[in-house]
Design a protein with these regions (language model features):
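Compact soluble domain cores
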Residues: 6-75
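Short linear sequence elements within intrinsically disordered, low-complexity coil regions
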Residues: 35, 56, 75, 85, ...
């Protein structure tokens, strides 16, 4: 379990693991199972490496300029980019958990915030 006090709900966070915890998890998100490859092609993200880099960049970003966010009691960082409809979740210690474009956009973010979100540091 990660110390949620070491994670910023709204500020910038630095990820020690700059990507998914391993190649299999990255591959599972990009091209196997629930594939996100097709979701990101319109954004010009056409490789799993670009997808992974975008996820880390979003998760390390502070809130503002269309980016909303929170942390969880388990020390995960969640960010939602309203302009691009990207929802990402990850652990600064263990890496990216997921990034995708929710079908219902900001409503998905709001539901997740209500379920698990902590907005203060």
């Amino acid at each position: 379990k990660i110390n949620s006090k070491a994670v910023s709900a709204k500020g910038a966070n630095t990820f020690k693991v700059k990507g998914f915890p391993n190649k299999q998890k990255l591959n599972n998100h990009w091209q196997n199972g629930r594939t996100h490859a097709a979701e990101y092609a319109p954004d010009g993200i056409t490789t799993k490496e670009q997808y992974e880099k975008r996820a880390v960049q979003l998760l390390e970003s502070p809130c503002g300029n269309g980016i909303k966010g929170y942390k969880t009691k388990d020390g995960l960082v969640c960010r939602y980019d309203a302009k691009k409809n990207d929802f990402a979740k990850g652990s600064p210690e263990k890496g990216v958990r997921t990034m995708f474009k929710p079908d219902d956009g900001e409503d998905y973010y709001k539901r997740q915030l209500e379920l698990e979100g902590i907005e203060d540091d």
